[in-house]
């Protein structure tokens, strides 16, 4: 009877623990870069599991073989010092494991830093992703539009993100598309991604940047090229242009909803690259006198799956 209750308690504990589990975004890839990283994670888990099992098996063997017995008290087990086979295993196996993981890391890093596999030769969609306290600004030079705190991307096309910050160092991360990369002031870093399938995802700042860090997230939606083109057309027909005054207001610390503009801030506040490298962003000198009022209205997204309202200015 006691055994029955023990087993029931163990089963109940397992069920309760598993009920709180959900799929990890990094292990649910939606693009080739994320798939490469997920493969490395699973490979690492598998190898570590083998190591743990082998070590536990050796531990059980040693505890069993050299347990207390009826041998004389002055008995000493044979020493293995100087045993070349044992010493080679003890030293060689860890070295081989480190070398293997090093090779895997170099190969995978080269893959995720390059144009995604299967997309070479295609023109990427260049998106400037800049951060401020505590917002994300996405500029689409090719389409001449800009969004705040949400990102629409086409599937089956390479994406080239140009990352920089108007404030403290942040880290741009869309777990289901690839790894994180730092966005810093006075310089631009480049991140190559691609989405193989449509769907909604979550992106965030993965580097602590003050009291608003926890809410420093953005919505991501991947869609077909046709739907993406329709969205761009709708934005150009309904959104108001972004101005330098309005943009400087957005750079002030605080949270905002999802905003949409025509034009980009790159026209009057270019990214810190090329001849503009080292330019100081977010200076108080840039906060010029405000003129006019800015009216906002709800953006009715053409995609029925969009749950949150986008404000067009």
Which residue ranges define each predicted feature?
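Positively charged n-region of N-terminal signal peptides that target proteins for export
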Residues: 1-5
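Short, intrinsically disordered, charge-biased short linear motifs at domain edges
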Residues: 6-7, 192
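Sec-dependent N-terminal signal peptides
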Residues: 7-13
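Lipid-exposed faces of alpha-helical membrane segments in multi-pass integral membrane proteins
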Residues: 14, 47-60, 89, 93-100
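C-terminal motif of bacterial Sec signal peptides marking the signal peptidase cleavage site
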Residues: 17-20
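Non-transmembrane, membrane-proximal soluble domains of secreted or membrane proteins
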Residues: 23-39, 67-313
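Membrane-embedded alpha-helical segments of integral membrane proteins
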Residues: 33-70
């Amino acid at each position: 009877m006691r055994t029955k209750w023990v087993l029931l308690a163990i089963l109940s504990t397992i069920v309760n623990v598993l009920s709180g589990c959900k799929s990890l975004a990094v292990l649910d890839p939606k693009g080739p870069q994320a798939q490469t990283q997920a493969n490395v994670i699973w490979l690492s888990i598998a190898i570590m599991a083998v190591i743990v099992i082998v070590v536990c098996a050796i531990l059980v063997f040693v505890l069993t073989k050299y347990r207390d017995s009826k041998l004389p008290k002055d008995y000493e087990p044979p020493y293995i010092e100087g045993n070349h086979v044992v010493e080679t295993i003890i030293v060689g196996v860890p070295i081989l494991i480190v070398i293997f993981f090093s090779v895997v890391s170099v190969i995978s890093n080269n893959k995720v830093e390059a144009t995604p596999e299967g997309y070479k030769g295609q023109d990427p969609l260049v998106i400037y992703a800049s951060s401020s306290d505590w917002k994300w600004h996405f500029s689409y030079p090719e389409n001449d539009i800009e969004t705040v705190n949400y990102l629409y991307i086409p599937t089956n096309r390479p994406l080239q993100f140009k990352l920089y910050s108007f404030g403290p160092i942040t880290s741009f991360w869309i777990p289901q598309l690839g790894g994180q990369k730092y966005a810093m002031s006075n310089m631009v870093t480049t991140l190559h991604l691609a989405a193989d399938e449509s769907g909604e995802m979550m992106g965030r700042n993965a580097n602590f940047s003050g009291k608003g860090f926890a809410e420093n997230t953005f919505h991501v939606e991947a869609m077909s090229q046709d739907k993406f083109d329709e969205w761009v057309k709708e934005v150009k027909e309904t959104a108001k242009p972004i101005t330098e005054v309005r943009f400087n207001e957005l750079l002030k610390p605080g949270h905002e909803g999802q905003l949409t503009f025509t034009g980009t801030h790159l026209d009057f506040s270019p990214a810190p690259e090329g001849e503009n490298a080292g330019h100081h962003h977010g200076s108080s000198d840039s906060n010029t006198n405000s003129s006019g009022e800015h009216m906002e209205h709800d953006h009715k997204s053409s995609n029925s799956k969009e749950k949150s309202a986008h404000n067009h200015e």
